[in-house]
Amino acid sequence: MMRLLCLGTVLLLISPLSADGPRDNDPTTVRRVPRLGVDVPEEDVTKLNKGLDELAGMIQRVQQQGDQQAMSLLPDVMIYHRAVKDNLEHQEFFAPGDIQKAHRVLATGIERARQLIGGHAPWTSQTGLVVRGFISRLDQTVQPYGLVVPPTYRADGESRARVDIWFHGRGETLSETSFIDQRGRQAGQYTPAGTIVLHPYGRYSNAFKFAGEVDVLEALEHVKQHYRVDEQRISVRGFSMGGAACWQFAVHYADRWFAANP
């Protein structure tokens, strides 16, 4: 019995030492995350590239016009181009349905660009599901986030809205395209009355750490700039991986939240 106990102790001591060996850093043996996506039919590739070129031209047109208001809202358009372009280039459409999402996302981006060129930005005062974007101070990339704006919210009103940040769970196939499409079509399970719900993307599924952590803070600041927010009523919430993120933000930034609900 004593020998078995000693052997068990030795194995327990050895296992952590070998848990992160050289093989864990070999890209040929470590499981790819995310997995390689499906092959995209040539017809879809052609159509998506044509749409990307059209949207890129419209973005350039807004930039050339030099209107400061339009320029400040351009990230709300650029997120659609970046998502589809990157996911197409890196083969990050994981099911045939993702390809259809890309077509929808691209169409929305083109429509927004058309509105912005015409001097309009109706999504900025829209209630319900709204997808917005900001330029990261870390690497100057455009990053998306989703909002659920309550029907009672008025941009020109006097009252300020509570904001709940909802951290999404782990999803190895949650590309930017899928996230943007989801946030434009699904409110999620948590929509408290009179509350703006902020859904950060957080750079895929890194538990909202590293650049994902900074993205959350920047997304919140962007919301404060564009919406009437009650800064005394901002909370963090989440489930699964999002619950871990909630704990992290509750501990690291305890003075910022009136509640934390992992």
Language-model features, listed with the residues they occupy:
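Active-site machinery of serine-nucleophile hydrolases
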Residues: E158-Y227, F258
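Soluble non-cytosolic domains of exported or imported proteins
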Residues: E42-N49, M71, P75, P96, ...
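Primarily recognizes the serine-hydrolase "nucleophile elbow" in alpha/beta-hydrolase
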Residues: R132, Q232-P262
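Amphipathic, heptad-repeat alpha-helical segments
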Residues: G21-V77
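Charged, amphipathic alpha-helical oligomerization/scaffolding segments
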Residues: K47-E54, R61, D76-A83, K101-T108, ...
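Bacterial N-terminal signal peptides
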Residues: L5-P16
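A domain-start/cap signature at the N-terminus of enzymes
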Residues: D20-V38, H90-A161
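Amphipathic, non-membrane alpha-helical rod segments
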Residues: A70-A95
